[in-house]
Amino acid sequence: MKETLINIAKAYVGESQARNRYTFYAKIAKKEGYEQIAEIFLTTAEQEKTHAKRLFEHIQELKANDEELKIEVSVPAVYGTTAENLKAAIAGETYETTEMYPTFSKKALEEGYEVLGKRLAAMAIAEKNHKEKYENLLKNLEEGTTFI
């Protein structure tokens, strides 16, 4: 089995987890009175769902017929205040931007998956946008300039 298939499965699981965490984080932000942050968590969750769907489609293209993929994954378990959740989201998006997607893109290209390699590189850019958005929200929250 090619390494790219395993990488895509890991990315799919990561995006699926992020989507769920962000919906959980949105509820906390809303409960704490941060409507803007809650909305951005929800919007980003939908974007992560789109990423997961595309990755799942790539799994279908690369896997054998009834193949079940077994992978090892980490589960980020931060579930705290809005500030703590933003920090956790920033850490996750930073990993995807600086390590995961660049590494997966390079491997896909090495294995001859040019379109997939380019798509993974593009996903790194999208994740960088998420990271920057969360960094700005955290900065505003820490400075007390967040809309409530």
Annotate each predicted stretch with a short phrase.
Residues 1-148:
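Non-heme di-metal
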